[in-house]
Amino acid sequence: MAAVVAATALKGRGARNARVLRGILAGATANKASHNRTRALQSHSSPEGKEEPEPLSPELEYIPRKRGKNPMKAVGLAWYSLYTRTWLGYLFYRQQLRRARNRYPKGHSKTQPRLFNGVKVLPIPVLSDNYSYLIIDTQAQLAVAVDPSDPRAVQASIEKEGVTLVAILCTHKHWDHSGGNRDLSRRHRDCRVYGSPQDGIPYLTHPLCHQDVVSVGRLQIRALATPGHTQGHLVYLLDGEPYKGPSCLFSGDLLFLSGCGRTFEGNAETMLSSLDTVLGLGDDTLLWPGHEYAEENLGFAGVVEPENLARERKMQWVQRQRLERKGTCPSTLGEERSYNPFLRTHCLALQEALGPGPGPTGDDDYSRAQLLEELRRLKDMHKSK
């Protein structure tokens, strides 16, 4: 019955995803009594022994468009619900993890750590385009992992650095950011798992609210609530003052180099407010995003602002990096202000080109939110060259 429901929900929304889901369902049916799989789903729905999940929040927006590509790229509301609220999402993540490990045995990109007066930030390429991070106090030899979706890759980096993992910071619940929580927290028994209690983070031990601070050695990391991609999405700001270096923003799926995340669980006003939260940070703040999307995002930025010279210079640099499979993070918030269209909704040129004009009461935030929604719609239909 589950296979029929899932196949019906996905009808017309991408044959490839339907085939993947049917394969997962078939495998799951054959192994449905597996003890290990069902135990792995703490904080998420499982096929038995759990109450039925509540309906999706009415704030969750999914608006099919009349032309162009489906903005959720054949994911759809039904698949999103399955991915985030049932055990099928975990099985899908495990399948993607195996494929990525086979395709990119050394990671999808070549990355370099950044060292600042005894604090090291180490990007770890995982899955097909994700980044996890280790934040290390090199004097105390203590480490914090951000979004450790591939526990094997993160553990290898921990062992190579010779550090003790004491905390995991999860930006949000999606499996490509939280999938390694179980294995790492079991391996490192004193490791704490931080995240939003609103998001159903797997193996969460220490819930965080807006402006809460996590202290590890000299590391002072502040959680900032940034809902929109998910209801409980958090970003993490490493304070640069204790080590006399730049602050670092670990942005998950809120903000990318020249892009921002999809609004799965909110609306344009919510996402605009979250983006404005990080816009209030200093220009020298380093941006460490959750995905390697730079080249595609800059290509879209060139469509909406073709005469933006800052974007053109950054695109040339990114293309040189990607020719050698080098990662493109970090950028700075100062750079992002100059070319990221999702941070430029206040710019008159963009408003005149794409915006709907002022709101019914002349509210500037209304027109900026409408412009952000239009940018998101255009980006979802954009095909990078």
Curated annotation (Swiss-Prot):
Chain coiled-coil ranges: none
Tissue: Isoform 1 is only expressed in the brain. Isoform 2 is ubiquitously detected with highest expression in skeletal muscle and detected in myocardial myofibrils.
Pfam families: HAGH_C, Lactamase_B
Molecular function GO labels: hydroxyacylglutathione hydrolase activity; metal ion binding
Modification after translation, per record: Undergoes cleavage at the N-terminus.
Cofactor note: Binds 2 Zn(2+) ions per subunit.
Region of interest (Disordered), ranges: 32-58
Entry-linked CDD domains: hydroxyacylglutathione_hydrolase_MBL-fold
UniProt record, GO biological process: methylglyoxal catabolic process to D-lactate via S-lactoyl-glutathione; negative regulation of neurotransmitter secretion; neuromuscular process controlling posture; regulation of dopamine metabolic process; regulation of synaptic transmission, dopaminergic
Binding-site residues for Zn(2+) 1, renumbered to this chain: 172, 174, 229, 253
Name of the featured protein: Probable thioesterase PNKD
